[in-house]
């Protein structure tokens, strides 16, 4: 008699995805972030659902409802801070996951990679809209500044911005629609994640060496289920340390002041995970140019597979490309720092240089270094 997990239509899908899935025997801890992203998504949906039960999407009561959740709702404070810091953990895992894909050449699975880029954009949109909901000063002004960027689009820009706002400024209509979108998008993300996995399981996972591993596969369970549980425990530990000891570490103090359209904060900035893109946006004096650079800073990931010149897939045995990769990581950290600084000397110059380096590494230096390494190996 066949085991029920191999015959039952639903159990079969789970079995082929998480139990009997053939996985390379040498994938490292860098392959843990996919499952951690799944856990983050589930955590965000659950905590978000409980927050939505008490939140009111109205400009008059939104700020008070968040205060009410923290003060009066049973364990409301922990749900709120798990949701806010859970977003930070989500982005840490996302950046690690994308970085792993770039380092080990996983982008050669083009369908999986492109769905991943779509997922990244969707998660960023969701996080941005979520940041607007508490209706603090930074929520309001962040929404005003970022949505206003669309006015740089020639001819239709102004109409587009007013259409998104639902009026002539960020107001009740904007908050209501942002709440509606923030609620629905995580479910769209879940569907996209399922498609992402579907395409991944068509080809099988990549591995650190970048070599086809069909001759050396092991079952996902118990080897990688146990390994993923270790990653999960470390994720929960980090999240709970943040939530219970310094919940406001990654937030902005300005967001504890209710939104006031008559008073602009001295320095408007988004959450930390958008600062690198914000720094690239600010480094270009022209509005339309800045918006294009902002979009391209993420969209550039889509052309990375086309710029792969090396005859090796992974960077594991390519020391020159490794140096360049870590230089890129340092550059992104510099951009993140600059994004949080005021627009004054010397930060403007540092931001402009870091932005030039960012695009130069990805568009020019990476392909050149790949070719040099081929020549060094006489390929």
Curated annotation (Swiss-Prot):
A ubiquinone binds at residue 201. It holds the Pfam family Cytochrom_B_C. Its cofactor is heme b. One of its GO terms (molecular function) is ubiquinol-cytochrome-c reductase activity. It is a multi-pass membrane protein. PROSITE patterns: CYTB_CTER, CYTB_NTER. GO terms for cellular component: mitochondrial inner membrane; respiratory chain complex III. It is found in: Mitochondrion inner membrane. Keywords: Electron transport, Heme, Iron, Membrane, Metal-binding, Mitochondrion, Mitochondrion inner membrane, Respiratory chain, Transmembrane, Transmembrane helix, Transport, Ubiquinone. GO terms for biological process: mitochondrial electron transport, ubiquinol to cytochrome c. Its main location: mitochondrion. The chain crosses the membrane at residues 33-53, 77-98, 113-133, 178-198, 226-246, 288-308, 320-340, 347-367. InterPro entries: Cyt_b/b6_C, Cyt_b/b6_C_sf, Cyt_b/b6_N, Cytb/b6-like_sf, Cytochrome_b, Cytochrome_b_C_euk/bac, Cytochrome_b_N_euk/bac, Di-haem_cyt_TM. Heme b b562 binds at residues 83, 182. It comes from the Eukaryota. Heme b b566 binds at residues 97, 196. Binds 2 heme b groups non-covalently. Component of the ubiquinol-cytochrome c reductase complex (complex III or cytochrome b-c1 complex) that is part of the mitochondrial respiratory chain. The b-c1 complex mediates electron transfer from ubiquinol to cytochrome c. Contributes to the generation of a proton gradient across the mitochondrial membrane that is then used for ATP synthesis. Heme 1 (or BL or b562) is low-potential and absorbs at about 562 nm, and heme 2 (or BH or b566) is high-potential and absorbs at about 566 nm. The cytochrome bc1 complex contains 11 subunits: 3 respiratory subunits (MT-CYB, CYC1 and UQCRFS1), 2 core proteins (UQCRC1 and UQCRC2) and 6 low-molecular weight proteins (UQCRH/QCR6, UQCRB/QCR7, UQCRQ/QCR8, UQCR10/QCR9, UQCR11/QCR10 and a cleavage product of UQCRFS1). This cytochrome bc1 complex then forms a dimer. Belongs to the cytochrome b family. This is Cytochrome b. It comes from Viverra zibetha (Large Indian civet). The lineage of its organism: Eukaryota, Metazoa, Chordata, Craniata, Vertebrata.
């Amino acid at each position: 008699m066949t085991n029920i997990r191999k015959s039952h239509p639903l159990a079969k899908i789970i079995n082929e995805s998480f139990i009997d899935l053939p996985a390379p025997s040498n994938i490292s801890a860098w392959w843990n972030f996919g499952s951690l992203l799944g856990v983050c998504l589930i955590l965000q949906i659950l905590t978000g659902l409980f927050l939505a039960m008490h939140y009111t999407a109205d400009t008059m009561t939104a700020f008070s409802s968040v205060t009410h959740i923290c003060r009066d709702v049973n364990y409301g404070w922990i749900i709120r801070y798990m949701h806010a810091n859970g977003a930070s953990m989500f982005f840490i895992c996302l950046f690690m996951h994308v970085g792993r894909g770039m380092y080990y050449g996983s982008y050669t699975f083009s369908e999986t990679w492109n769905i991943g880029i779509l997922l990244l954009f969707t998660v960023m949109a969701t996080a941005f809209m979520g940041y607007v909901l508490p209706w603090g000063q930074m929520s309001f002004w962040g929404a005003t500044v970022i949505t206003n960027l669309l006015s740089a689009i020639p001819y239709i820009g102004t109409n587009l911005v007013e259409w998104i706002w639902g009026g002539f400024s960020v107001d009740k209509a904007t908050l209501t629609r942002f709440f509606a979108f923030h609620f629905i998008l995580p479910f769209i993300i879940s569907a996209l994640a399922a498609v992402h996995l579907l395409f991944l399981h068509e080809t099988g996972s990549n591995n650190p060496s970048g070599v086809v591993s069909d001759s050396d596969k092991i079952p996902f369970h118990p080897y990688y289920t146990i390994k993923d549980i270790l990653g999960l425990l470390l994720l929960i530990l980090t999240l709970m340390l943040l939530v219970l000891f310094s919940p406001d570490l990654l937030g902005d103090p300005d967001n504890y002041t209710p939104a006031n359209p008559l008073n602009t904060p001295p320095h408007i900035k988004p959450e930390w995970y958008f600062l690198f893109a914000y720094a690239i946006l600010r480094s270009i004096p022209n509005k339309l140019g800045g918006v294009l650079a902002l979009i391209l800073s993420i969209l550039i990931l889509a052309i990375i597979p086309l710029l792969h010149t090396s005859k090796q897939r992974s960077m594991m045995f390519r020391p020159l490309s490794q140096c360049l990769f870590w230089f890129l990581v340092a550059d992104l950290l510099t951009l993140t720092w600059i994004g949080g600084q005021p627009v004054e000397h010397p930060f403007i110059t540092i931001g402009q240089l870091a932005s030039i380096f960012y695009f130069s590494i990805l568009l020019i230096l990476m392909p050149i270094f790949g070719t040099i390494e081929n020549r060094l190996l006489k390929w």
